[in-house]
């Protein structure tokens, strides 16, 4: 297994719990004589840290491993910045759900030590890349680990659009919007809209309509290498938005085209050896436990 010597730390701003966890993590890593580099934004709220700092984009060039302290949203942002560097990312959960940041703060030293000693699992999670075009000219681009979402923005009106897959017309729809999600994102917004849960190892994309004005509007799972094209109706009276992971936003105009496809670079997500995807789903989504209360 890969040995990590240069460790980057990214943290969610605005949380004293995150700062406390970063201090613990810093102390633990330095005791192991590792080189620790703080993202510059979190370094600003940690006076006297005494560490090298770096922008998020450059962390991928100077680190062997990046540890994200926060929630899934924090890891989503880090993933988009770091995927192009092919650098492993490990998450310590200081958020709510923790589908991606799966190390609890109370087990920080134990689990991080296991990873540093070479005992870990690596998952390659693919991202989506989206491009908004107007009059055949790109006006916005973004990446997403979870999903690319077409939605009405501040308006309450429905959106009318056409869907094409690999150049073939699929259907037109009137709906509140459309979610295009990866397997990683299938347990996020797409799940709330009635989409299926997809195992992270699946090479597939799910297209989930949001409140379609039809009884036949259902999610569609397509090959992960498909290219999706969404054409906003020219007669639309509103200016909908495209969001990548709910964090990057672009405003569309009637007649615009949104192209969504798999990004060539993948996120290398690190897990402890005892990571169990189904246990995560069972815990986070409230699935039923073993009959009779057995834990074997």
From Swiss-Prot:
<keyword id="KW-0547">Nucleotide-binding</keyword>
<dbReference type="GO" id="GO:0051287">
    <property type="term" value="F:NAD binding"/>
</dbReference>
<dbReference type="GO" id="GO:0005524">
    <property type="term" value="F:ATP binding"/>
</dbReference>
<keyword id="KW-0963">Cytoplasm</keyword>
<dbReference type="InterPro" id="IPR017438">
    <property type="entry name" value="ATP-NAD_kinase_N"/>
</dbReference>
<feature type="active site" description="Proton acceptor">
    <location>
        <position position="72"/>
    </location>
</feature>
<feature type="binding site">
    <location>
        <begin position="187"/>
        <end position="192"/>
    </location>
    <ligand>
        <name>NAD(+)</name>
    </ligand>
</feature>
<keyword id="KW-0521">NADP</keyword>
<comment type="function">
    <text>Involved in the regulation of the intracellular balance of NAD and NADP, and is a key enzyme in the biosynthesis of NADP. Catalyzes specifically the phosphorylation on 2'-hydroxyl of the adenosine moiety of NAD to yield NADP.</text>
</comment>
<dbReference type="GO" id="GO:0003951">
    <property type="term" value="F:NAD+ kinase activity"/>
</dbReference>
<dbReference type="GO" id="GO:0046872">
    <property type="term" value="F:metal ion binding"/>
</dbReference>
<dbReference type="Pfam" id="PF01513">
    <property type="entry name" value="NAD_kinase"/>
</dbReference>
<feature type="binding site">
    <location>
        <begin position="72"/>
        <end position="73"/>
    </location>
    <ligand>
        <name>NAD(+)</name>
    </ligand>
</feature>
<feature type="binding site">
    <location>
        <position position="157"/>
    </location>
    <ligand>
        <name>NAD(+)</name>
    </ligand>
</feature>
<keyword id="KW-0520">NAD</keyword>
<feature type="binding site">
    <location>
        <begin position="146"/>
        <end position="147"/>
    </location>
    <ligand>
        <name>NAD(+)</name>
    </ligand>
</feature>
<feature type="binding site">
    <location>
        <position position="247"/>
    </location>
    <ligand>
        <name>NAD(+)</name>
    </ligand>
</feature>
<dbReference type="GO" id="GO:0006741">
    <property type="term" value="P:NADP biosynthetic process"/>
</dbReference>
<dbReference type="GO" id="GO:0019674">
    <property type="term" value="P:NAD metabolic process"/>
</dbReference>
<dbReference type="InterPro" id="IPR017437">
    <property type="entry name" value="ATP-NAD_kinase_PpnK-typ_C"/>
</dbReference>
<keyword id="KW-0418">Kinase</keyword>
<dbReference type="GO" id="GO:0005737">
    <property type="term" value="C:cytoplasm"/>
</dbReference>
<comment type="similarity">
    <text>Belongs to the NAD kinase family.</text>
</comment>
<dbReference type="Pfam" id="PF20143">
    <property type="entry name" value="NAD_kinase_C"/>
</dbReference>
<protein>
    <recommendedName>
        <fullName>NAD kinase</fullName>
        <ecNumber>2.7.1.23</ecNumber>
    </recommendedName>
</protein>
<dbReference type="InterPro" id="IPR016064">
    <property type="entry name" value="NAD/diacylglycerol_kinase_sf"/>
</dbReference>
<keyword id="KW-0067">ATP-binding</keyword>
<dbReference type="InterPro" id="IPR002504">
    <property type="entry name" value="NADK"/>
</dbReference>
<feature type="binding site">
    <location>
        <position position="176"/>
    </location>
    <ligand>
        <name>NAD(+)</name>
    </ligand>
</feature>
<keyword id="KW-0808">Transferase</keyword>
<feature type="binding site">
    <location>
        <position position="174"/>
    </location>
    <ligand>
        <name>NAD(+)</name>
    </ligand>
</feature>
